[in-house]
Amino acid sequence: MKIAVQTSLPAFQNDIGDVVRLFYGEGAAVEETQQADARLTHIHEESNGEWRETFVLTDCSGRTEQNTLSAPVVSGGLEEKRQKKRLIKRCCYMLLKRLSGRQPAWGSLTGIRPTRLYYQQLENGKTRGEARHTLQDLFDLSQEKIDLLDEILDAQQGLMDRRARACDVYIGIPFCTTRCAYCSFSSGEIGDGRLVEPYLAALLHEIEACAEMAREMGLHIRVGYIGGGTPSSLTTPQLDRLLAHVERHFGALAEFTVEAGRPDTLDAQKLRMLRDHPVTRISINPQTMNDATLTRIGRAHTAKQTVEAYELARSIGFDDINMDIIAGLPTDTLPSFEQTVEKLLELRPENITVHTLSV
């Protein structure tokens, strides 16, 4: 079923489309001008201090079904957008749930870690029981998924730093040894490296400014993540200088991840340098263990090099390793993807992240 989505608030078009896809699958939400089996119209109104959201579904025969929800207006930046989005999605969700007869296990949630919502409820002073009711009443989570969240929270007790005035910092290194065919990130080939030193100088200055800003705001920096690009495309001295600067200005971190990224950028010297700093976690990202596919997408390493880099990291003492793979790469097939997964499972990294190719 294809549903043409029309809204008076274009900024929320994709959010409404996410809800449509919950019930009718990928490709169900289409532009208003495209041929569709039904039209979903969203009307936003604001009066007397209330938001009023109405969704009307009209089928090809002209028959209509609708749902309306209201809530007090919330003013102020990000929180205003968040609360308005929740109301819009909830109103749309309730209508489509009624008409489709379907019950998504995660309710109306799309594109968010549900544990974050659970923690937010607890940080706002609610008991676990009250937080569970909120997740069920506001987001329509199934009992099974709420129980799963409880299990996750129990497992994380003592591991998570939930100070209200805490923040996490991402540090981007926009350089790679080669550019992958599918890549849409703001990164480029490192080439002769002439841009690295000017970038590092600016980055070190920004780290100092970020640390000072956190102090002024009373924020504790909890987690650090250096990603890219490929951070390990920097030379060992360059990466050493960056890590020392992070330690000096951010202090002790509960978790500190460095994307070691491509196996061909790693050697014993660089891995030992990472280990000498308080790096608690690294990523070694093959994307696929199929050599033909690696060549096709522009990766300059082999599956064998991935295994060698992983085993070297283990021998140097890294006990928390993530490995990224991508499903749907050019020339990759279901059997070859299954082989990639099987090879990674044999290595037994602490975490495997599976991305789907998006062009």
What are these regions (language model features)?
Residues 11-16:
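Short N-terminal binding/cap micro-motifs at the start of the first secondary-structure element
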Residues 2-3, 20-22, 26-79, 88-89:
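Short, well-ordered secondary-structure micro-motifs within conserved domains or adaptor modules
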Residues 171-187:
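Local cysteine-cluster metal-coordination motifs and their immediate loop/turn environment
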Residues 187-359:
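Conserved non-cysteine loop/helix-boundary elements of the Radical SAM core domain that shape
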Residues 77-103:
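Accessory, often N-terminal, substrate/partner-engagement and coupling regions
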Residues 99-103, 123-169, 217-218:
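N-terminal [4Fe-4S]-dependent radical SAM core
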